[in-house]
Amino acid sequence: MAGPELLLDSNIRLWVVLPIVIITFFVGMIRHYVSILLQSDKKLTQEQVSDSQVLIRSRVLRENGKYIPKQSFLTRKYYFNNPEDGFFKKTKRKVVPPSPVTDPTMLTDMMKGNVTNVLPMILIGGWINMTFSGFVTTKVPFPLTLRFKPMLQQGIELLTLDASWVSSASWYFLNVFGLRSIYSLILGQDNAADQSRMMQEQMTGAAMAMPADTNKAFKTEWEALELTDHQWALDDVEEELMAKDLHFEGMFKKELQTSIF
């Protein structure tokens, strides 16, 4: 038999639930604009820009080569994939993985990430836990097992309380992870207000900071271009155009009426 249902005071909604939502939302908004002010443009070398443009040209050739004559397609393909002196064969780039010890820019970016992500979460989370501790704020609309009690009832140690109830501290963390759709609606898809996404990026920052291997990209593009054959897409375009009823007479009448009025 289920125990008696809890009845929360309406003042909890006004002085605990809504303030936590508003504070979390505006902290995310401030974090977004502070991140924009602190972000630094990544400088690319001339070699990196040139390599990226070459890969784009090869990809465009594979996708749209059917709209140019076969000889033009083979000439461009020969420039990239010539077995002896083709660009993808003769070009070898030296990949040097960056190190925070030798790269001050990478170290600065890591410090900026800590300032805009970790520090606000510690300060705001600690302040909310101190100010609104001990409150039961809301209840999820479905039953949960006892394994969810440590996650949803931080700061409340009641063994008899149903696991569906949410404490004030847990309500803050639910807002941190649950407001991402609101941030995307207001600030766009790629925003710095989503703290959960920034935490994931910070955890995988070392892997993301590793540069892409240009030699592997050249090899992959060489294989893809090598398998691409020329398929002339404009073979019967003249016959198809002449076979269509273009209705030029009606178009000329419409233009004449427009010019008169």
From Swiss-Prot:
GO terms for biological process: protein insertion into ER membrane by stop-transfer membrane-anchor sequence; tail-anchored membrane protein insertion into ER membrane. SMART domains: DUF106 (SM01415). InterPro entries: EMC3, EMC3/TMCO1. Residues 39-114, 188-261 are cytoplasmic. The chain crosses the membrane at residues 15-38, 115-130, 169-187. It holds the Pfam family EMC3_TMCO1. One of its GO terms (molecular function) is membrane insertase activity. It comes from the Eukaryota. It is a multi-pass membrane protein. Its main location: endoplasmic reticulum. Residues 2-14, 131-168 are lumenal. Keywords: Endoplasmic reticulum, Membrane, Transmembrane, Transmembrane helix. The keyword Nucleotidyltransferase does not apply. It is found in: Endoplasmic reticulum membrane. One of its GO terms (cellular component) is membrane. The keyword Transmembrane applies. Belongs to the EMC3 family. Component of the ER membrane protein complex (EMC). Part of the endoplasmic reticulum membrane protein complex (EMC) that enables the energy-independent insertion into endoplasmic reticulum membranes of newly synthesized membrane proteins. Preferentially accommodates proteins with transmembrane domains that are weakly hydrophobic or contain destabilizing features such as charged and aromatic residues. Involved in the cotranslational insertion of multi-pass membrane proteins in which stop-transfer membrane-anchor sequences become ER membrane spanning helices. This is ER membrane protein complex subunit 3. The lineage of its organism: Eukaryota, Metazoa, Chordata, Craniata, Vertebrata.
